[in-house]
Amino acid sequence: MTTDSLALDFKSATLYAIRVVLHDADLDRLTAALDQRMADAGSFFENEPVVVDASRVDDPIDWPALLAALRGHNLPPIGVVAEGANLAAAQAAGLAAVELSTPPARPAPAVETAPPNDAATPVPAVPAAALETGASATTGNAPAEPAPAEPAAPAAAPQPPAVPAPASALVITKPLRSGQRVYARHTDLVVIGMVSQGAEVIADGNVHVYGPLRGKAMAGARGDTSARIFTTQLDAELLAVAGVYRVVEDKLDSTLHNQPALVYLDGETLRVEALKR
């Protein structure tokens, strides 16, 4: 190995990116929709890499102008999903063709089951020496009678692979004021107190707010579709799970407004349900 080869190395990596799905090729409508979405979402998506999905658009797209609009909102475009002339034009503008995959849901925790009654007493493991075959023992010059064969001791049951403990939840024990933003990377977020209007709570896992949720909440920030939002008092500006979000422009139904609630993703639809007290 030469000295030069030590200057870099290749490693596999998984990159999370926002998927921006185009339904129109008209630049004015696209930029207006982008401005509105980013105004609604605040800083949720800022500095997140973007893959532009133009697979549903046949008309030609002004790629340089669209990419400039995305960068203007601190959304760096890195890839494209498209076909034909739009794919070629996007690649000419500097995007790489990518294939999209659905992010896996968080694996369910392992559940231990009690062994049956007749197997409650564990069988001790047999030492390795007891399984070896050796020459028979002798007394004097007379050959010894072969010892009666003993039944082989049962082997110890294979142990299940160790499951790493999940990261501890990030717990915030004070109210969050307008303009404050908290992000729990690779874990759940628990806020004990109020999330004020203009504040943002984000987690790769679940979001729990034990108090009024009046700001913006996003669970499953890295694409976990099984993540959920829980709050004891729902009055949010924006709710999002795995990138699917809902801006709360009008007051929620009386069965949900200022009530304990659960927010989760059902396919591509964001569901908001009241929690029974």
From Swiss-Prot:
Residues 137-164 are annotated as: Disordered. One of its GO terms (biological process) is regulation of cell septum assembly. It comes from the Bacteria. Keywords: Cell cycle, Cell division, Septation. InterPro entries: CAP/MinC_C, MinC, MinC_C_sf, MinC_N, Septum_form_inhib_MinC_C. Residues 145-164 have a biased composition (Pro residues). Belongs to the MinC family. Interacts with MinD and FtsZ. Cell division inhibitor that blocks the formation of polar Z ring septums. Rapidly oscillates between the poles of the cell to destabilize FtsZ filaments that have formed before they mature into polar Z rings. Prevents FtsZ polymerization. NCBIfam families: minC. This is Probable septum site-determining protein MinC. It comes from Bordetella petrii (strain ATCC BAA-461 / DSM 12804 / CCUG 43448).
